[in-house]
């Protein structure tokens, strides 16, 4: 990624001239060189004013509103999503590959319409209660702007309606003092970032770094139109080969396919995150952070945090139904691998966009406090045995929209420093 500031002067500016010139070709190298020289001269003549400007507009790191390096440091500020105006996505190939067959008639009938009104009302109430409890626990809560997701839109490559702003974890990732907007992979989520822009602009004005990953065209070439939807066996074989409904046509990823542990960040190739997307993130975060690809026995991977949820330094929840192929990496580092109990959510409860394993999709308020579903008594007891106090909140109707506490939130600021847990 090229930054404008690389041409302001100094050795980095000179390196940028050489690089940009080589990429553009000899005919434009002279123009780049002249631009660099004039910029360098202007920078030298106004060095004092630039220094004063930098001091005025760039707060010290301790003043930055965005700062989070892992999933468990003491939580100070969080973004919580909205269920209001949530719409059923059109039943396209990428949606079909990420949903259970028993719900396909629901999508075929309701695609482009609002989710059932009564259910949304209950979900809204649950999330409001979650926000109230977070506030009582001393956490600052931010909410995305309300948007009507039923509006149709069209790009040169596709047309769609929207989905929701319920799951900030899917679209936003905080790494240190930087907030990264993920490009997403569902066409119904193309404009989801708009709900968060007022929040992110405020963070930016107050000193946070703000990066938007390359936006995919989401043209037909991004999706395998012949992906074997019905055959679980075929999907297992393809998953083992690293092949999913999204192709490598262009980078795409959801932020929820990454999970942080200080300098080490773990990512999975999934139905919505491709290798190009992971590679973009790896290059962008290097050399301060190391991005590792891990995989699971899962024919339908989408988002890592209901499969592999890191809840403390050296402590991870690992889904017994989707074992991690690289689990020895964590065992050799001395980590404790905890297998969560089977969820107790009833079979007849609608889970239009997820599995029952949202029970392990928990939010850590710090190493000794966890927000957990009030109905999931077995996992509450598991946490208590680990010496972790549970903050019980009913979120079952909100689960139906595809996420648990971790999905419904994006931790913006945690009180802690960057550390390595694998050296």
Curated annotation (Swiss-Prot):
Provide the free-text tissue specificity comment from this protein's UniProt record: Highly expressed in the kidney and pancreas, especially in the proximal tubules of the kidney, and alpha cells of the pancreatic islets (at protein level). Moderately expressed in liver hepatocytes (at protein level). Expressed in the kidney, pancreas, liver, colon, ileum, jejunum, heart and skeletal muscle. In reproductive tissues, expressed in the testis, epididymis, ovary, oviduct and uterus. Expressed throughout the brain in neurons, astrocytes and oligodendrocytes. In 12.5 dpc embryos, it is expressed in the middle part of the somites, hepatic primordium and wall of the dorsal aorta.
- Major subcellular site: mitochondrion
- Subcellular location, record wording: Mitochondrion inner membrane
Root EC class? transferase
Instruction: Name positions with the PTM N6-acetyllysine.
Output: 385
Q: Which residues bind arginine?
A: 170, 305, 322, 354-355
Might you report a single GO cellular component term?
mitochondrion
Database matches in InterPro entries: AmidinoTrfase (IPR033195)
List, in alphabetical order, the GO biological process terms annotated in this UniProt record. Answer: creatine biosynthetic process; creatine metabolic process; embryonic liver development; kidney development; learning or memory; muscle atrophy; positive regulation of cold-induced thermogenesis; response to flavonoid
Q: Which residues carry this modification: Phosphoserine?
A: 46, 49
Catalytic activity of the protein: L-arginine + glycine = guanidinoacetate + L-ornithine; 4-aminobutanoate + L-arginine = 4-guanidinobutanoate + L-ornithine; beta-alanine + L-arginine = 3-guanidinopropanoate + L-ornithine; taurine + L-arginine = taurocyamine + L-ornithine
Instruction: Name residues in a coiled coil.
Output: none
Transit peptide (residue range): 1-43
Gene3D superfamilies annotated for this entry? L-arginine/glycine Amidinotransferase, Chain A
SUPFAM superfamilies assigned: Pentein
Tell me the route in metabolism or biology where this protein functions: Amine and polyamine biosynthesis; creatine biosynthesis; creatine from L-arginine and glycine: step 1/2
Q: What Enzyme Commission number(s) appear in the record? A: 2.1.4.1
Keyword Membrane assigned to the entry: answer is yes
Q: Which UniProt keywords apply?
A: Acetylation, Membrane, Mitochondrion, Mitochondrion inner membrane, Phosphoprotein, Transferase, Transit peptide
What Gene Ontology molecular-function terms does this entry list? amidinotransferase activity; glycine amidinotransferase activity
Active-site residues are 254, 303, 407
Give the quaternary structure: Homodimer.
Similarity comment:
Belongs to the amidinotransferase family.
- What is the name listed in the Swiss-Prot or TrEMBL entry for this protein? Glycine amidinotransferase, mitochondrial
Q: What is the species of this protein?
A: Rattus norvegicus
């Amino acid at each position: 990624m090229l930054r404008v500031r690389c041409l302001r002067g100094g050795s980095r500016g000179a390196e940028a001239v050489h690089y940009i010139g080589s990429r553009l070709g000899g005919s434009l190298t002279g123009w780049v060189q002249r631009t660099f020289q004039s910029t360098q001269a202007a920078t030298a003549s106004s060095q004092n004013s630039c220094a004063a400007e930098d001091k005025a507009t760039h707060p010290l790191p301790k003043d930055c509103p965005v700062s989070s390096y892992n999933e468990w440091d003491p939580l100070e500020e969080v973004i919580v999503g909205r269920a209001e105006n949530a719409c059923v996505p059109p039943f396209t190939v990428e949606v079909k590959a990420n949903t259970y067959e028993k719900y396909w008639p629901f999508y075929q009938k309701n695609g482009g319409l609002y989710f059932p009104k009564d259910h949304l009302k209950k979900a809204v109430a649950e999330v409001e209660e979650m926000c109230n409890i977070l506030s009582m626990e001393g956490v600052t809560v931010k909410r995305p702007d309300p948007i009507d997701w039923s509006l149709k839109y069209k790009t040169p490559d596709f047309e769609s309606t929207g989905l929701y702003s319920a799951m900030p974890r899917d679209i936003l990732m905080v790494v240190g003092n930087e907030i990264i907007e993920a490009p997403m992979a569902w066409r119904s989520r193309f404009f989801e970032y708009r709900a968060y822009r007022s929040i992110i602009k405020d963070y930016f004005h107050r000193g946070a770094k703000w990066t938007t990953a390359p936006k995919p065209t989401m043209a037909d070439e991004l999706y395998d139109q012949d992906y074997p939807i019905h055959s679980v066996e075929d999907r297992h074989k393809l998953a083992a080969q690293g092949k999913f409904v999204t192709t490598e046509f262009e980078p795409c990823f959801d932020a929820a396919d990454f999970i942080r542990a200080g300098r080490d960040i773990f990512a999975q190739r999934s139905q919505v995150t491709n290798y190009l997307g992971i590679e973009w993130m790896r290059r962008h975060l290097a050399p301060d952070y190391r991005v590792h690809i891990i995989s699971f026995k899962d024919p339908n991977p989408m988002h890592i945090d209901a499969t592999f949820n890191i809840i403390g330094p050296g402590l991870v929840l690992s889904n017994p139904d989707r074992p991690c192929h690289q689990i020895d990496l964590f065992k050799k580092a001395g980590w404790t691998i905890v297998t969560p109990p089977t969820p107790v959510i009833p079979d007849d409860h609608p889970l239009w966009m997820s599995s029952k394993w949202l029970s392990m999709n928990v939010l850590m308020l710090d190493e000794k406090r966890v927000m957990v579903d009030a109905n999931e008594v077995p996992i509450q007891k598991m946490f208590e045995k680990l010496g972790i106090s549970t903050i019980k909140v009913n979120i079952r109707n909100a689960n139906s929209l595809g996420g648990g506490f971790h999905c419904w939130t994006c931790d913006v600021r945690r009180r802690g420093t960057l550390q390595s847990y694998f050296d």
